[in-house]
């Protein structure tokens, strides 16, 4: 609604719609510091009648502001990511963006100290052992020694994710979240597994609003009302621990809150059936049933996975119904469950950076993930929340 302005300040101005003497000014134009000539109106009725076309002035001004900010960043060495992290460009790639978000420039790759043990992709971006391992086809039964290493690694990964959660608020960039993840991982003696994995340029994934997964931390500042998923994987003592959570940024609308809550419940319900003898394909049935009951959809392009000394290996864990996942759970197996749930349809597209998966319809998406160990009697959540974990979900009690 237009606000009344000091009469003397607009006495010489005309209505932007009908050219009658102006008495009101658009408050959004005032906030954006736009010229008063295009912000002035004679009456509320005239302002409302002009709104459908007038609001485009705000969008253009905001895009121009973003362009100016990004130009400053590019002059400081920040560039847009393309070709799955193998190249950079100073120009925003052309793309039919599905929602309000667009790519932002990213900072240079963060450095890992020489003394930190590194996976085989750390230097040249190419995993050597993982794609050729027999464990891409056979689900490994972990030894007690491997399980103990995984417990240690997953606890570190949880502590790193909690550190990231504590800095999330409006105005923080996802690049800053990545810095926190990187430094916390290094401080614990670990390596951030995503860094340079098939050339992924950052130490964690940050997926905002319509981004489903694999969002690259960048210069965009989180805004009040956003939701953001932070996905952390730590490599420590030769094995990996993987988890993620979706967080609220400031005051989030009820539909987004329900999306996040339902996604959390999907993961919890899936974990509840994990025990020896259960077929992997049953996980998708459980997740899909709960999501669709809430009018939501399950992403089909990305799945949970085996994990241990390898970042990704068998089994494959689809989250949708009527999937063809093979195999039965056995004690000693470790894998992730990580449902991605969309407010709209399940289909996705990938940004020009080659990594960022977004909803095809531009609607929001949420995700939660844990690394799990199948025990003789059920399941151990290796990445479970700690007593010290931030209290960020109103439906949880410590």
UniProtKB/Swiss-Prot annotation:
The gene is MAP1A. Coiled coil: none annotated. GO terms for molecular function: initiator methionyl aminopeptidase activity; metalloaminopeptidase activity; zinc ion binding. It comes from Arabidopsis thaliana (Mouse-ear cress). It catalyses: Release of N-terminal amino acids, preferentially methionine, from peptides and arylamides. SUPFAM superfamilies: Creatinase/aminopeptidase (SSF55920). Zn(2+) 2 binds at residues 26, 29, 54, 58. A protein binds at residues 214, 312. Zn(2+) 4 binds at residues 242, 305, 338, 369. Its EC number is 3.4.11.18. PROSITE patterns: MAP_1, ZF_C6H2. Keywords: Acetylation, Aminopeptidase, Cytoplasm, Hydrolase, Metal-binding, Protease, Zinc, Zinc-finger. A zinc finger (C6H2-type) spans 12-65. Associates with the 60S ribosomal subunit of the 80S translational complex. Belongs to the peptidase M24A family. Methionine aminopeptidase type 1 subfamily. It comes from the Eukaryota. This is Methionine aminopeptidase 1A. Its main location: cytoplasm. Pfam families: Peptidase_M24, zf-C6H2. Ubiquitous. Its cofactor is Zn(2+); Co(2+); Mn(2+); Fe(2+). CDD domains: MetAP1 (cd01086). Binds 2 divalent metal cations per subunit. Has a high-affinity and a low affinity metal-binding site. The true nature of the physiological cofactor is under debate. The enzyme is active with zinc, cobalt, manganese or divalent iron ions. Has high activity with zinc; zinc cofactor is transferred into the active site region by the ZNG1 zinc chaperone. GO terms for cellular component: cytoplasm; cytosolic ribosome. Zn(2+) 1 binds at residues 15, 18, 42, 46. Cotranslationally removes the N-terminal methionine from nascent proteins. The N-terminal methionine is often cleaved when the second residue in the primary sequence is small and uncharged (Met-Ala-, Cys, Gly, Pro, Ser, Thr, or Val). The modification N-acetylalanine is found at residue 2.
